[in-house]
């Protein structure tokens, strides 16, 4: 017996997809313009997870550009005859593609692009039928003309795995459970007891989000909806309920025949979401040929008790991320924007430190700044880092950033102002930079501390074991999805820049920790 605590993956791990091989489960999530892309997790008990890598871990697999909410949308992972398949959409470049691996920890292949004309739309998934044939299921705009925003349909077509090409006719099989519903998306196909089941989300990935299901005896036929659709949602629970935006789900069974659903949902704080959309778990039973989610409860629960043996990992995903830099390979939890390249960081130039190189790219612009972040996982947290940095010119800076997107983030930086060194607290809100507080410092050898709770933050520096308050009660609501828009949650990370000019300077970090308090 094991108990999982929801969300099972905290922080912005949206659009979860899961598969099982034996008693091992593998789960993937969207990554947008963060790189490396598509984090992959392993679990045996659906309660405790380890990250075994990032599927798109090299630039040749992951051409990215544009807004932070572009890039990789809604991956699906499946296993068939010893081969793992991950299919997803890169909305920045190339559209829908597949990568494969014999080991889910990698290496994964180069992308097989399906063609933006041949495979239009987003949210692709794969289904392997009993005869071994593989089928693509995805979403696309109404081919007869989009009548309203979100007027899309779900379609299916055979996929030739030898050529990695779609073959034969394509057919629309569903448009969503409710009349004129918007954004039928995240489709997945399953086969059970002689029926093909189509699970999907609809109504958009916000408060009205919902999960519906349809079925058919034949794959190439219009599906019939469950009479109880939508089968799962939180939109009926009101805006003060602690979990909202529930949708985009995937089903999996265990070796004992028990069924589960993973799905995304959000946990707002003071009515706003800085964590993005997280991964939750629910039990599923089948009644009268249809799935019932969390029977007798009908909503997500804080705990999920399962008849599986507990299995723990030495490097388990928790709400404490403590990074020290004795290793020569960067931790998989760190992500960059567009690229995570040794062009701008090193773990060997100064052993025991992470060195970030100052480059012209600035974090308030789209592009690839010298930034390495990890996901914010809780509303009440403490983030801190130790750094050694001496800016040579007024344009140089380094420190720590709470990042929502290019136009909305909180900069905590060591800077030079004429002949003085300063620590600067600088919110960036809707593209406007604000100098909220500064503190003169004698050197750039210090610790930066951010303590947050209830959408407010206090900022400290620590020098010679003295903790100094620099700014207090900073409003963090500008860094929420409701204020900033987009599809991502916050990351917190290390940052260095020469702001438009070339530089040979760098910042060395001794540690970086983000932990729940």
From Swiss-Prot:
Catalytic activity: Hydrolysis of (1->4)-beta-D-xylans, to remove successive D-xylose residues from the non-reducing termini; Hydrolysis of terminal non-reducing alpha-L-arabinofuranoside residues in alpha-L-arabinosides
Family annotation (Pfam families): GH43_C2 (PF17851), Glyco_hydro_43 (PF04616)
InterPro entries: ConA-like_dom_sf, GH43_C2, Glyco_hydro_43, Glyco_hydro_beta-prop_sf, Glycosyl_Hydrlase_43
Listed GO biological process terms: xylan catabolic process
SUPFAM superfamilies: Arabinanase/levansucrase/invertase (SSF75005), Concanavalin A-like lectins/glucanases (SSF49899)
Top class in the EC scheme: hydrolase
E.C. number: 3.2.1.37, 3.2.1.55
Gene Ontology molecular function terms on file: alpha-L-arabinofuranosidase activity; xylan 1,4-beta-xylosidase activity
Keyword Hydrolase listed: yes
Keywords, in A-Z order: Carbohydrate metabolism, Glycosidase, Hydrolase, Multifunctional enzyme, Polysaccharide degradation, Xylan degradation
Function of the protein: Has a 1.6-fold higher activity as an arabinosidase than as a beta-xylosidase when tested on the substrates nitrophenyl-beta-D-xylopyranoside and P-nitrophenyl-alpha-L-arabinofuranoside.
Similarity section: Belongs to the glycosyl hydrolase 43 family.
Protein name as catalogued: Xylosidase/arabinosidase
